[in-house]
Each structure stands twice: as C-alpha cells, then as structure tokens.
Amino acid sequence: MNIKNFSVELEFAVNDKPAKLVLESRSAIEGYEDENLKLVCLVDDSCDTHTLRIIVTSKKPLKMKSAQIVHDHFFGKREQFFANGYQSWTTSREYKRGDTQYGLRGPSKLPFARKIAGVSGDYHFTVYGRELFHSFTYTYLRNDSKVELFGSLNERTGYTIFYADMKTNVFVITKDVEGLTIDGEYELFNTVHTIGTYDAVFDRYFEAYPLKHTGRVDHFAGYTSWYNYFQNIDEKIILRDLEGLKRAGDAANIFQIDDGYETYVGDWDLDTKKFPNGMASIVDKIHAAGYKAGLWLAPFAAEFKANIVKEHPEWLIKNEKGKNQFSGIAWNGFYALDIEQQEVRDYIKAYFDKVFDDWGFDMVKLDFLYAACINPRNGKTRGQLMCEAMDFLRECCRDKIILGCGVPLGPSFGIVDACRISCDVELSFKERYYTKVTNQEIISAKMAMNNSIFRRHLNGRIMANDPDVFFLRDDGMKPAKFTMEQKKLLAKINHMFGSVLFVSDDIGAYDDEKMQILLDSYKEFDGKVISAEYVSHDEIEIVYEKDGKRHTLKFNTLTGANSEK
C-alpha cells in the first residue's frame, strides 16, 4: 500500500456549526490552512519503517466528531486482516473475505442487555458489519508470508482504530475523538507502516514504539487461586496449595492470591475471618518457599455493596445522565472510581502502599482496568483517560511487577510487565450456550487459545504474555470438564505461546503423569513458531521448529482433537 496515496477527512463543529474538511494526500502533505485550522502532514518513507503524522492546530475551538485517513485497497481473496481486540479479553484473530467479526450477538443486542453485555467492549463506539473488520492500536495485512503492518505510536490522543472494509475495498485509519475539543496544537495521528516477514515487522514496530518492554518479567510459572476456588479462598486453602506448589521446585517462581481475600471490592479491607493471621505472614511463607508473592486487585472497581459506594458516591464516575456509571457484572455489578479526583487517587495509592509496604507483595495483578475509560469525560478521549490511568497505576506500583488484565493493550505497552492477552478460560472445554449470544470478552477455552496464538507477536517484545491458566486436576472445588487430551492441548498452547504459566490446582494431589506435564509446561519454550493460521472454520495449524526439526500441530478448536507430525 502506498502510504502517500490517501485522503484525510475531518468532521467537527465550530461555534456549534458543523464543518467538514477533505484533503487528498498531496494537499495534506503540502500543508493546509483556513480560518478554522492549520493542518500539517509529515510523511517519511526513507527507511524500512515509514511514518505518518498529522498535526492540527486550531484557530478556534474545534469540537471533533470524526477523524480518519482513507486508503483505497483491493483485498485479495486470501489476504488476511488482523483484528486486535479492544482489550485483554476481546477476540483477536485474522479475518479474510467471507469471515465475520462478531460483535454483540442475539439477546445481548437488546437495549437493557446491551448495557450489561457491552460495557467491557467497544460496541458503543465502533462499527460492525458484513466483511467489515476493525483493529485497535495496530494491525497487519498478510498475504502468505508477506506482512504489511500499520501501528500507532500514540494512543494518548485517542484510540487509533484500523478498519478493513472488504465490500468497498477501503482501508481506513480512524481516531476515536469522541469528547475531544481541539484548542491549540493536537497530534491526531502518529503511525508507522512497514512490510516484511511476520517477525520482522513486529520487531520494527516495537523498535519504533516510544515505550519499551520493562524487562522485569521474562518468564513466570506458578499458581493462582482463582480457577479452582474463585472467591471461596481462605488461609488454610492458600497455605495448603503453597505447600503443594513446592513439588515443582525451582520450576516455579510465583504464587498469586486472587480475588476473595477482601471484604468488598473497592474497600480492600482484609477479611479476617478467612485470613485470621493477616497477609504479611502468608507473604513471608511464600518468600520462604522461594517464590515471588502476587496479589489480585481491581483498583478502579467498587462493587455495589462496597462501603465506599455509600460513603463516597461523589468518588464514582458518572454517566451522561449524572448517574453512577455501570461498569460490569462482576460481584453482581460494580461502578468505577474517578481518578480525575485527587481524593480518589490518594485513596487508591494508600491501599497500594499497604499491599507493598505492610503486606510485602512483589507483584499485583490489576484487573477490570477498562472501567477507567468506558466513556470520554472532562474533555478527554477514551485513549487519553486510559493512558493516564495506566501512568497512575505505574506511579502507585513504583518498580513492583504489574500483571495487567481486562485492559486495552495499547495504553498498557511499556507500563505493565506482563499482561493477559486472552479471555478467561472456561472450566469446560466445550463452549457453553452463552458464548454465542453475548459479547466477545466472554470466558472460553477456545478463544483463550485463539488469542494466545494470534497475539503471540507481543510476547517478549513489549510484555510477557499471560494466556490464562491451564488445568490438570480431575477434582477440586470447581472440577474442570476437560478430557486429558484437551488438558494437554491447552497446556501445550500456553507453553508455546505464553510467558506467564499458571495453574489453580492443588499440585500436592497430582499423580506422577500430571506432575511431569506440569514441569514440562512450566519450562520456557525453546522452539520457534514459523506460522499459525486457521486452515478451516474450526481448525488451526501451527508450524514450528524445535531441536532442529520442523513440526506441524493441527487441532480442532471445538473438540480439542489434535495431531502432530
């Protein structure tokens, strides 16, 4: 694609009067000025990584409605468009002509259900349609081994969303400018473009990206409590499973306590009935076993029942009607704290200080972070709100390890050390009925493996990828309904594509076979993935090299049936 062949289209209002500006590439590159604004377009195609920046300087306040760069592009029959989903959990994969990128489905499209099902995704500010695909922050077009990447270098001015309209054969780069008024100089777009092999284009993209991989986490292997007990944890369970993890020896290096230790999400008081000896004593035992200690938090969330909701309703983000912004269905519903207020920032920082200084944790898993930017507010776009929220979390966490989750990925680049790149894994390998009637963030073993494979390019370049857990147990408080073949497949995919490898099982109850699978899965993958793609509607084929030999793994995403040669 010729990056110098495009049009720039802006829609805005000046003094409440609608206006539109359309410039062909030549006019944009030469520079444009009128009574409302000055536009500068800077294009550099002198090296392998091309850059395009568009800067608008307003002469009067411009209330933005839309901003986009439009390229004509004929999409070939075999050409693949990669769609990076809105946040950690959102389905991310390649699409071609005839495919469908699903949004909300079935009953979830109804007004009341849409409010609930759609809040964690992009359904209220993006467009879904037949042979219309979109991607956040970056994307690529792939023809066999040739890959053409487009990526944003700045999400602070608004999310950059790439659309491939295969019906009309246009490729569009848009900026989510909802809520933005430009009053002065504003960088609307800052993008890169490069062509090469899959690995080469991502190497170049993250070389150009202004923030870098923190380097604090290369490989985590260990335990998290959530997927066996959910909120039903206590000191006895945690210490028993810590003892069980010791069977893994030096193969493990992290033990994480998940949701369930607190009285209410948002209050963050320790439930002393469950943990009568406090958290510091447990952290001491984790450290004595040779592991880093991790703790789950949802720092922007306040469940409906939390005391903070009753005592400080003014601390909550409000919607356009002045009501508390509904932010998700977890814990029977929760609101979001407004970190634009200094009192809220002080409150959140205080419990991070407790987690690190009083309790002694080394790592925090920070979840449901999308709640910071569901709607634009205070003249800031969603992208700006999310980037500033991530900056604040890094400030709170100092040099401690952050594992991000439920977070838009672009704003997390260079801030988090590791990040969930998939939805939660369902306790059943077979997909539940609700996966077909709700959003694209729903729990699913199938889509967790899908995302692990198709977001592999992030792993080690900008973060350590967390593909979510794998299961080996046969029983437990919440048995996993997987066959042994399905368990081994999930473990293998996580091992090949992830760098954060967790189970929630009581490892002390494993037999010798399960113990060996665990130890093999905990190791760093010492092979190289050559390619991975859907070869039919429900089959993925992975080609990789290991020990000097080329291997092909093919598996059915619905049944887990697989073969390798």
Locations of regions flagged by a protein language model:
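Aromatic-lined carbohydrate-recognition surfaces of secreted/lumenal glycan-active proteins
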Residues: S225-Y227, Q256, Y291-F304, M386-C419, ...
